[in-house]
């Protein structure tokens, strides 16, 4: 079957929609009348003929069919007239056939715009067949009727403001257009004459001067100017209903291509920006529900969207928290650091910059092809590094060589070495502002000022190795809590100042207190364990200790008393965490289990009874609220993030649990099944180390991302990371090193040698394409 041809003018033959129809009449206006008159008289025509049907008129449809068929004659533009029937007389009005509309007059003599095809009106039109035009035209302008002489040759009339509604003058054409000749260009002169090109000096005043400009042969009018004036005249003098009718006629006579262009233009400009049309608070709330990928895309949608997003403090705060770059409780601290780092930026800009930096770095962490910049620094004299702290851009390590070494994580260099202990350093805790506390096998606790590079206080009192320590703060007082192999915990107040003047006598410091009685910072001793205290954790006034006697004890350091004894493990306890937000205690043991204890409501645990110790009555709880199983060997390591509780064991496995309900979330195994010696976790990343293995996991996808970054290390002793920087204490070829990995930079590895007894560092940089070559230490 053949396809139907598409109409060239799709809207021409459709009925006028109801909302665009008009009824009744309108009073004649000078400017509109001038436009109608000019439209009729401006067309060049040598003759005019009345074509009539049996009733003396020709149907417009027949005329259009003839024009479409074509007669082979050259038909120049002509004046077309519509015959309007009245009871008493017939009046001819100029019309424009190209707009398929005409001016009609009702019984009151008022002009009315109607649709010719709908009203079955008849036309009196000029034809170019050489017949004579009527000698007289009766033109009805308003109520009055005027007779206009129509000679065989007619010149365009010059119409003044007073002539529009009262009379129409005719003139003689001196140079009539020859039949078949092309129409004159708007800028061309009449034959035999020369007309200089000059801009018109006439001023259009919304009356028949518009027609005067149209008819003018000696002036050049800007098309835009003329269009604006015509539109203004129509818009100011036509009622809205008639104006809509006229617009529809204009659109109806556009061809398919023009309609398509117009439709696209209308569609594009009718689009509505929902976000900017809403109140700012509601728009912001909508953005708060978007993920960061959508937020980044929204920044490029429009300037308004970009402004809303960029200037919103709450939005960037929400993104930082929701993407796990900062915890809700840590936001204020982050905001303070950012204000110090970017003092000239607004809060919104600081938060936005921080978020974008974190996103960029996280993508590098998650990219298995990304190789971070690696810097290797000389470690301790022994191969084993026992403890590591990474705070305030300080990386601090302790070892059995009795030394504490401090590195700068920003500049990736060794800073200084702290000496003073007479035994191995097994416990470290960074306080604030460069203050460090250490515990040693020499049974002492030392307080250090890193900025001044010296020890400020020495606390004595333990009878055996200080194996663990923590710092808690309660009512603006910071307490040092230490656990020892002598089965006790000691509590000291942390000195508020280093007490070392800038130019003091060095031999007077550190301040050494040989006995607790003479120590003004000593608070007391906590007794209750029957074996070595292996782990301690606390917050505020609550401290939890775990011992080789298989029990945990919950202490109140403000009152220096025991609160609860937690029994349930069947073997030594190696790690414990006090979850102060949920008021729970978490412990890991050699019995391969992890146990959860509810300290807010002790009746949620096992059987509860009361026991007494040397100080005060103490509740004894037999059995935990939850017991987590899955490991098959000693569980020696625990860490808690906002989302996950993570445990690591000697069976080479790492398991993740939901921090709220303790459901299983993930499980990883090192390929060599060697004991996990260290790991560190955030809500986005997990890093673990063991013998000959160092892994980085994407906790969002659950996939192993990196496994070969430190493949030249024989043993990973300790790891920690924050932001773009990961630090790892490792052993290679019987020596210890500190590795610094920068995930904001790629592919460059620095191998650095530091003289052990010097705070200055000699640097040697070697770059490799993959960063996997073994370290060569420069002597």
Swiss-Prot record:
Residue numbers of Phosphoserine PTMs: 104
A Pfam match: F-box-like
GO molecular function: phosphoserine residue binding; U3 snoRNA binding; ubiquitin binding
Residue intervals of the F-box domain: 272-319
Keywords: Cell cycle, Cell division, Mitosis, Nucleus, Phosphoprotein, Repeat, Sporulation, Ubl conjugation pathway, WD repeat
Top-level lineage group: Eukaryota
Per-repeat ranges for WD: 380-408, 420-449, 461-493, 528-556, 568-598, 630-658, 669-698
Region Disordered, annotated ranges: 39-80
A single GO BP: G2/M transition of mitotic cell cycle
Motif Nuclear localization signal: where in chain: 82-85
Subcellular location: Nucleus
UniProt-listed InterPro entries: Cdc4_D (IPR031740), F-box-like_dom_sf (IPR036047), F-box_dom (IPR001810), G-protein_beta_WD-40_rep (IPR020472), WD40/YVTN_repeat-like_dom_sf (IPR015943), WD40_repeat_CS (IPR019775), WD40_repeat_dom_sf (IPR036322), WD40_rpt (IPR001680)
Gene Ontology CC terms, in alphabetical order: 90S preribosome; nuclear matrix; nuclear SCF ubiquitin ligase complex; nucleolus; nucleus; SCF ubiquitin ligase complex
Spans traversing the lipid bilayer: none
Pathway noted in the entry: Protein modification; protein ubiquitination
PROSITE patterns: FBOX (PS50181), WD_REPEATS_1 (PS00678), WD_REPEATS_2 (PS50082), WD_REPEATS_REGION (PS50294)
Subunit structure as annotated in this protein's UniProt entry: Interacts with DCD53 and SKP1. Component of the SCF(CDC4) complex containing CDC53, SKP1, RBX1 and CDC4. CDC34. Interacts with CDC6 and CIC1. Interacts with SIC1; the interaction involves a SIC1 double phosphorylated motif (degron). Homodimerizes; the dimerization increases SIC1 ubiquitination in vitro.
Alphabetized PANTHER family for the sequence: F-BOX_WD REPEAT-CONTAINING PROTEIN 7, PHOSPHOLIPASE A-2-ACTIVATING PROTEIN
Function: Substrate recognition component of a SCF (SKP1-CUL1-F-box protein) E3 ubiquitin-protein ligase complex which mediates the ubiquitination and subsequent proteasomal degradation of target proteins. Recognizes and binds to phosphorylated target proteins. Directs ubiquitination of the phosphorylated CDK inhibitor SIC1. Involved in the degradation of CDC6 together with CDC34/UBC3 and CDC53, and in restricting the degradation of FAR1 to the nucleus. Is essential for initiation of DNA replication and separation of the spindle pole bodies to form the poles of the mitotic spindle.
Protein name: Cell division control protein 4
Organism, as annotated: Saccharomyces cerevisiae (strain ATCC 204508 / S288c)
């Amino acid at each position: 079957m053949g396809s139907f041809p598409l109409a060239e003018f799709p809207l021409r033959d459709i009925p006028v929609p109801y909302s665009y129809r008009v009824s009744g009449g309108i009073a004649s206006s000078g400017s509109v009348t001038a436009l109608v008159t000019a439209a009729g008289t401006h067309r060049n025509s040598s003759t005019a003929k009345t074509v009539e049907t049996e009733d003396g008129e020709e149907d417009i449809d027949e005329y259009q069919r003839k024009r479409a068929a074509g007669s082979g004659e050259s038909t120049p533009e002509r004046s077309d007239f519509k015959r309007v029937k009245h009871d008493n007389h017939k009046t001819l009005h100029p019309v424009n056939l190209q707009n398929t509309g005409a001016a009609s007059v009702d019984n009151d003599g008022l002009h009315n715009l109607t649709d010719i095809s709908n009203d079955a009106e008849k036309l009196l039109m000029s034809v170019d067949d050489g017949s004579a035009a009527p000698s007289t035209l009766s033109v009805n302008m308003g109520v009055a009727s005027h007779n206009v002489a129509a000679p065989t040759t007619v010149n365009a009339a010059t119409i003044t403001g007073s002539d529009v509604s009262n009379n129409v003058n005719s003139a003689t054409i001196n140079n009539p257009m020859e039949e078949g000749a092309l129409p004159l260009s708007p800028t061309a002169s009449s034959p035999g004459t020369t007309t200089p090109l000059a801009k018109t000096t006439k001023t259009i005043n919304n009356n028949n001067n518009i027609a005067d400009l149209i008819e003018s042969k000696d002036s050049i009018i800007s098309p835009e100017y003329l269009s604006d004036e015509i539109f203004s005249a129509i818009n100011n003098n036509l009622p809205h209903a008639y104006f809509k009718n006229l617009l529809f006629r204009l659109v109806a006579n556009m061809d398919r291509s023009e309609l398509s262009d117009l439709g696209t233009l209308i569609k594009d400009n009718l689009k509505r920006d929902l976000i900017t049309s809403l109140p700012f608070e509601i728009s912001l709330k909508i953005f708060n529900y978007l993920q960061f990928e959508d937020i980044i895309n929204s920044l490029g949608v429009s300037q308004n969207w970009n402004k809303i997003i960029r200037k919103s403090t709450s939005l960037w705060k929400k993104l930082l928290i929701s993407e796990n770059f900062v915890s809700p409780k840590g936001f204020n601290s982050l905001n303070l650091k950012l204000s110090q780092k970017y003092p000239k930026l607004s809060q919104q800009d600081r938060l936005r910059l921080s978020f974008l930096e974190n996103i960029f770095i996280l993508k590098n962490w998650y990219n298995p092809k990304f190789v971070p910049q690696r810097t290797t620094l000389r470690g301790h004299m022994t191969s084993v590094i026992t403890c590591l702290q990474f705070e305030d851009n300080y990386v601090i390590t302790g070892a059995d060589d009795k030394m504490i070494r401090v590195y700068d994580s920003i500049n990736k260099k060794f800073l200084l070495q702290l000496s003073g202990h007479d035994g191995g350093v097994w416990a470290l805790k960074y306080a604030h502002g460069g203050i460090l506390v250490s515990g040693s096998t020499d049974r002492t606790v030392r307080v250090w000022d890193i900025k001044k590079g010296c020890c400020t206080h020495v606390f004595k009192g333990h009878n055996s190795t200080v194996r663990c320590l923590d710092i808690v703060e309660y009512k603006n007082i910071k307490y040092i809590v230490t656990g020892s192999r002598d089965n006790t915990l000691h509590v000291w107040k942390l000195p508020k100042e280093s007490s070392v003047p800038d130019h003091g006598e060095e031999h007077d410091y550190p301040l050494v207190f040989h006995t607790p009685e003479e120590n003004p910072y000593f608070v007391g001793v906590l007794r209750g364990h029957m074996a070595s205290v292996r782990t301690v954790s606390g917050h505020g006034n609550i401290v939890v200790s775990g011992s080789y006697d298989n029990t945990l004890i919950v202490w109140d350091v403000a009152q220096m008393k025991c609160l609860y004894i937690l029994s349930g493990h069947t073997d030594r306890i190696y790690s414990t965490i006090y979850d102060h937000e949920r008021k729970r205690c978490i412990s890991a043991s050699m019995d391969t289990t992890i146990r959860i204890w509810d300290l807010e409501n002790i009746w949620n645990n096992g059987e509860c009874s009361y026991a007494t110790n040397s100080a005060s009555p103490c509740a004894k709880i037999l059995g935990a609220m939850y017991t987590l199983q899955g490991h098959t060997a000693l569980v020696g390591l625990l860490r808690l993030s906002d989302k996950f509780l993570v445990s690591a064991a000697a069976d080479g496995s790492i398991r993740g649990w939901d921090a709220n309900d303790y459901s299983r979330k993930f499980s990883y195994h090192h390929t060599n099944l060697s004991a996990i010696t260290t790991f560190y976790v955030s809500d986005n990343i997990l890093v673990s180390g063991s013998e000959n293995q160092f892994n980085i996991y994407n906790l969002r996808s659950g996939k192993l991302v990196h496994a070969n970054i430190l493949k030249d290390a024989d043993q990973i002793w300790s790891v920690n990371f924050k932001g773009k920087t990961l630090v790892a204490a490792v052993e290679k070829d019987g020596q210890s090193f500190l590795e610094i990995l920068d995930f904001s930079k790629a592919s460059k590895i620095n191998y650095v040698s530091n003289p052990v007894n010097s705070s200055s560092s000699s640097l040697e940089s070697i770059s490799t394409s993959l960063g996997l070559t073994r370290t060569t230490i420069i002597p």
